[in-house]
Regions:
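Membrane-embedded helix-loop-helix hairpins and adjacent transmembrane boundary segments
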Residues: 1-530
Length: 530
């Protein structure tokens, strides 16, 4: 732990916080629109950076590099194949959300089905954030920072105690940032962190390969390409962690849900000043996802050659960073990892507050004819963020005892919440006659079936394939239920809150992105460098 790395870490982190504070100081957050949607005033560059950094947390740095170290590059499919889903979201989903004036995903479901469906989905979202998203983000950040710095080594605490302390440091910092600054402050810091992430992506291959080759960059690069090449393969076989076939089943569904229906992601897209800026922002985030294998995953590949048998494989990323990078770059990497963790944590907190205040608390006040003021709603939202933060910080350290790998644990648990929501939204998009009863029964059917087949019964089927099968069965279930309840025709109500003209030249850019997606899979295969 060098003084230079700590000083650079503190200076970079302080600069980002100060810059965000200066940019937002003249705009006090006094309305729910300002707290949750940055007053719909973000341009495409801010939207793209916010989308990318809300997606990239310490979970990816820790989880994906662990998977590459223990298995191979097949885990990159989560990010690279998501480009197709993101483009579909930009083309079809975003226009619907902007056109209907929906501020939350449950808000749209309330318009499409009914208010009880809106409440049910809001509760499922909140459970997902409190149980899965927020604790996992804190744990991933704690593992990364503990491995890189181990600030509290002089206290001679155990690894478990270190994790507890770092979880609370990240959680308290993130909570304060979200409560005081709102979505605008989060979006600005994300944009700066995107630049830092790109810098790391350029610098790490240089320093990592140079260290691997004992000072000779080309020798290190040759070692990476000629030894343990099985780890370079992104085309997963049946026994790999991510088989290739899952890209076309459960993974595609989860990616489409994540980028088009996950509240804390969609909320970033809806903060744009127009539909065109939102679509451009999504396209910019796609470019970032294509660069991620070169930015995020190189440490795992280098770690394969440096460490033959790690006891805690989740530590491979921080160990590689600590051993290969110079002090200033360690500080920058730590600042970006901390910033990414705080960014995703903040986005989840902000969305949790949005869901609670707009979909549960405000309707409860209206039902009782109580006075509602923007000031009171903002105050309630901030209090709720503090409560959710505390719950996440108390539960995060226990992820260490998960039997599955960290990233697999994260995706398995996430599937239980996201795919049923995806199903009822997709059916709502496609069919205008499916009633609210079908949506509620479909959600309950999916969640209980997934718990039984994935956690209670020992079904020898990859969880992503199981998610795809349950998606099909739940869709059939909803259509069957629809036959026994009175049908009604849903009529979309159009609310033009921002400029709705789409991005004119998007198809050329979309085509280039899809070509890039295929090229990266070919590169990391037996036809390429694997």
């Amino acid at each position: 732990m060098s003084v230079l790395s700590i000083v650079s870490f503190l200076l970079i982190t302080g600069f980002i916080a100060l810059f965000s504070a200066l940019k937002t100081r003249k705009k006090k957050v006094q309305t729910t629109n300002g707290l949750f949607f940055a007053d719909h005033n973000n341009n495409f560059f801010i939207v793209g950076g916010a989308l990318l950094l809300s997606n990239i947390s310490a979970n990816q740095f820790i989880g994906e590099n662990e998977s590459i170290y223990t298995n191979n590059m097949s885990v990159m499919a989560w990010g690279v194949s998501s480009v197709l889903a993101m483009l579909l979201v930009a083309e079809f989903f975003l226009p619907i959300y902007f056109r209907t004036g929906a501020m939350t995903i449950p808000d749209y479901l309330g318009k499409r089905y009914d208010n009880s469906t809106k409440r049910l989905v809001s509760i499922v979202f909140l459970c997902s954030y409190v149980v899965n998203l927020l604790p996992a983000v804190l744990y991933g950040g704690a593992v990364a920072l503990t491995g890189m710095f181990n600030f509290i080594a002089p206290l001679q605490l155990s690894y478990w105690q270190n994790i507890w302390i770092m979880v609370w440091v990240i959680g308290l910092t993130g909570c304060a940032y979200s409560v005081l600054g709102g979505l605008r402050a989060i979006s600005i810091s994300d944009t700066i962190l995107s630049i830092g992430l790109l810098t790391i992506g350029i610098a790490f291959p240089y320093f990592g390969f140079k260290f691997l080759g004992n000072g000779d960059w080309f020798k290190g690069f040759h070692i990476l390409l000629s030894q343990h090449t099985e780890h370079l393969n992104a085309i997963g076989g049946p026994k790999d962690e991510i088989p290739l076939s899952t890209i076309f089943t459960g993974m595609f569904i989860m990616n489409l849900y994540y980028w088009g229906m996950e509240q804390f992601i969609v909320q970033q897209a809806l903060s744009a000043k127009s539909l065109s800026h939102s679509q451009k922002g999504m396209g910019l985030a796609c470019l970032g996802k294509l660069l991620c294998p070169f930015i995020i995953n190189i440490p795992g590949l280098v770690g394969v050659h440096l460490y033959s048998n790690l006891e805690n494989t989740a530590e491979v990323f921080p160990l590689v960073v600590k051993d290969t990078l110079p002090g200033v770059m360690i500080g920058l990497t730590a600042a970006v990892v901390l910033g990414a963790a705080i960014s995703t944590f903040n986005a989840g907190l902000n969305s949790s507050s949005t869901l609670f205040v707009l979909n549960l608390y405000k309707p409860w006040l209206e039902k009782r004819n109580k006075e509602i003021t923007e000031k009171h709603l903002v105050y309630t939202g901030r209090k709720f963020e503090i409560i959710v933060s505390a719950l996440a910080m108390f539960s995060a350290p226990f992820i260490m005892f998960s039997k599955a790998g960290f990233y697999t644990y994260l995706q398995q648990l996430g599937g239980m919440f996201c795919v049923p929501i995806f199903t009822i939204i997709l059916v709502g998009f496609v069919s205008k006659k499916v009633p609210p009863q079908a949506a509620k029964i479909g959600m309950i059917f999916f969640i209980f079936s997934y718990i039984i087949f994935n956690y209670i019964l020992d079904i020898k089927l990859h969880y992503l394939h199981m998610l795809a099968l349950l998606f099909v069965f739940t869709t059939i279930c909803m259509l069957v239920v629809a036959r026994f309840y009175p049908k009604y025709k849903y009529t979309e109500i159009k609310i033009e809150s921002v400029e709705l003209s789409p991005w004119k030249n998007r198809y050329w850019y979309f085509a280039l992105l899809l070509m890039g997606m295929v090229s990266i899979f070919v590169l990391f295969s037996k036809w390429g460098i694997a």
